[in-house]
Amino acid sequence: GLRDALYDAGLVADNRLAVAGASMGGMTALGIMTHHPEVRSVACLMGSGYFTSLAKTLFPPQDLTEMTARLADWEVTRALPRVADRPLLLWHGDADDVVPPDGTFRLQQALKREGLDGNLTCLWESGVRHRITPAALEATVAFFRQHL
């Protein structure tokens, strides 16, 4: 798979494998974190850990039950301890008009409530819609510099 190709190409130094993504890519990065402990840190920009509930607002209702059932195994909120044991960056604009920021807030609060927020960095950018800002990119680079 992709992981093996990265290692084979010599793109992973000292087993320092990390994943970052924005929007759906951020959700994918969170899902990867639930199943791949070899990933040392993850940055999720304007994504959501609540895949099944977000899917209900983004997709037409016709095949929703089957689709959300497949997403459930990857949902971060069902695997909080597995994502809390490594550095995690959550970044979201508080005016996001595509992926509601409440999913990021709920994940942040769930980790705090369970006492699992020791490796969490959660950054909010005021007035930002569904866009990646220069500040978000700078924060992501700084995060990986610190945690890789």
Locations of the language-model features?
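Residue-level signal for short, function-critical loop segments
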Residues: 23, 94, 128
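Hydrophobic/aromatic beta-strand patches that form the interior of the parallel beta-sheet core
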Residues: 43, 89-91, 123
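A structural signal for the main folded, soluble domain(s) of proteins
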Residues: 27, 39, 45-48, 63-65, ...
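The feature captures the conserved acid-bearing segment of alpha/beta-hydrolase catalytic domains
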Residues: 53-111
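Short, surface-exposed basic-aromatic patches at helix termini and helix-loop junctions that form
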Residues: 33-38, 109, 141-142
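Primarily recognizes the serine-hydrolase "nucleophile elbow" in alpha/beta-hydrolase
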Residues: 2-63
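Short, conserved active-site loop motifs that form the nucleotide-linked donor/cofactor pocket
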Residues: 17, 88, 120-121
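C-terminal catalytic histidine-bearing segment of alpha/beta-hydrolase fold enzymes
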Residues: 105, 113-148
